[in-house]
Amino acid sequence: MRKLIEGLRHFRTSYYPSHRDLFEQFAKGQHPRVLFITCSDSRIDPNLITQSGMGELFVIRNAGNLIPPFGAANGGEGASIEYAIAALNIEHVVVCGHSHCGAMKGLLKLNQLQEDMPLVYDWLQHAQATRRLVLDNYSGYETDDLVEILVAENVLTQIENLKTYPIVRSRLFQGKLQIFGWIYEVESGEVLQISRTSSDDTGIDECPVRLPGSQEKAILGRCVVPLTEEVAVAPPEPEPVIAAVAAPPANYSSRGWLAPEQQQRIYRGNAS
């Protein structure tokens, strides 16, 4: 606590006076550009990894970056989503998972959690679809690899939950909302973007980031590419669906390559 108190003192005596005009503007209202939904994990700082300034992100954080579907017990996520889009007119949403996620590890031992941490057990029910998909379709992988598969699949599951909200469906229909699925790799600092799946009809940009072909990283057969400051972001353009997707390497690695079983249901964009 002493470090926190010292930090508060430094903020009030040093940082605040040199940014007084900014805080006076904040007192008049907020105008964030992006709704950023991510995990409560202490190793993730949305403003740090995106190099965003104060007031640029409207952030929702919880264990596992979960989004209860519309109509589920209200834990605050739904109200925050509705406020961000309806009141603040945010047009971009990022759902960001991360490597080594403790919540995803918990999904693999859910029955044990029911006794040890019943509240966590109840909360993770919002990721049951992710758990069932992975356990039914990814047999034969080691635990560490399954965690990383869960991380990626969970991002897509939560995007589907997000799309159950009336305000989200309405803005998607109007073309006024874009949804992005990201995976932050704690060990490398790299952020990967997942493209929409073949079952999606709208709402998730299909590879708006373009890389030279040699640098493109295919994960789970999706178009998943590193997002770095050197990469130019172009407006999304329609991409042809590629029926055959290059297979991942034979040796599965939890740092980047995910499993081949998902290739049949995933789009992959062309690098240009």
UniProtKB/Swiss-Prot annotation:
Its EC number is 4.2.1.1. It holds the Pfam family Pro_CA. The keyword Transit peptide does not apply. Zn(2+) binds at C39, H98, C101. It comes from the Bacteria. Its main location: other. Keywords: Bacterial microcompartment, Carbon dioxide fixation, Carboxysome, Lyase, Metal-binding, Photosynthesis, Zinc. PROSITE patterns: PROK_CO2_ANHYDRASE_1, PROK_CO2_ANHYDRASE_2. PANTHER family: CARBONIC ANHYDRASE (PTHR11002:SF76). This is Carbonic anhydrase. It comes from Synechococcus elongatus (strain ATCC 33912 / PCC 7942 / FACHB-805).
